[in-house]
Amino acid sequence: MTKKFLSIVMAGFFSFTAIADEGMWLPQLLQAMNESDMQAHGLQLTAEDLYSVNNSSMKDAIVSLGGFCTAEMISSEGLMLTNHHCAFGSIQEHSSVSNDYLKDGFWAMSRDEELPNEGLTASFLVSIEDVTARVVAEINPDMTEQERRVKIREISKTIVDEATEGTHYNARVKSFFGGNDFYIMKYETFKDVRLVGAPPSSIGKFGGDTDNWMWPRHTGDFALYRIYCAPDGTPAEYSVENVAYQPKHHLPIQLNGVENGDYTMIFGFPGSTDRYLTSFGVQQALDITSPTTVDIRTEKLAIMKAGMDANKRTKIQYAAKYAQTSNYWKYFIGQSKGLKSMKVHDKKIAIEDDF
């Protein structure tokens, strides 16, 4: 999981044929770029149903959990669904040798039993605005890379301050497409997020590192939280006086399953992509970055495992750290294999030569 404040995107998988028509788009661009194609492939919603600044839309049910995961609102009473691996840190924080929720799972039988999680946030996207012209106007080709970065940070802070002045919102200017486009993302962030339930790790982490980053998966990778807010509906720190948040939109639960050819898509907060790396960047990843990362994490995992195997309390205390480390240890191993087998470096060179 990537610990960054994430940007919301939509990925579509149009599955009327065996070959998926795939892509990833910023939701505010759907109407101009993709709406008709998505509807032709079976989408029964409009772009306005998916993303609207002025009206309730699907974006209001999609949550950035802690800035490192995506979650979804599934009830009008603040209930939020996410992955077990996204809640793993919370589950660990509440576990002890005598009360091991990692091993046994946890289920709150009432609202009073739901567990608060200090520092965990749930952020809803309010709006996205293109600020490319304003940022680009402040930089020029004669700047060094360091000067460019400093100037972008300065103008981004000004844009954010102006956008959030007099509100309880927070915002961030993010770059896209290799630093060619800039958008400001405005969020409403809630700070009282309580753990409602999670299965035992034998279900939530079934398959462990062996199955991680693989397909198909057979893991019950889910957990439930509930968002709380002040009585007036605004974000508030944890308090017994807080009430369950009533989202502008929540996703209905469909129990009938899916059929072959159904339209499917993902709406959420991904991490980052290296898709626009040059051939030199790919070569660096293959020769230096990935193998070094794998080697360091291999040693780190071995050190942690030795201590965890020797003491149950230590095993619980380091469970989340170990999972986070092994997650991208496995990722970089697979990424290197994929880059080599797909001959990505050679393809990048061909693209650059053609350009």
Predicted segments — roles?
Residues 2, 9, 16-355:
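Terminal presequence/propeptide segments associated with secretion/organelle targeting
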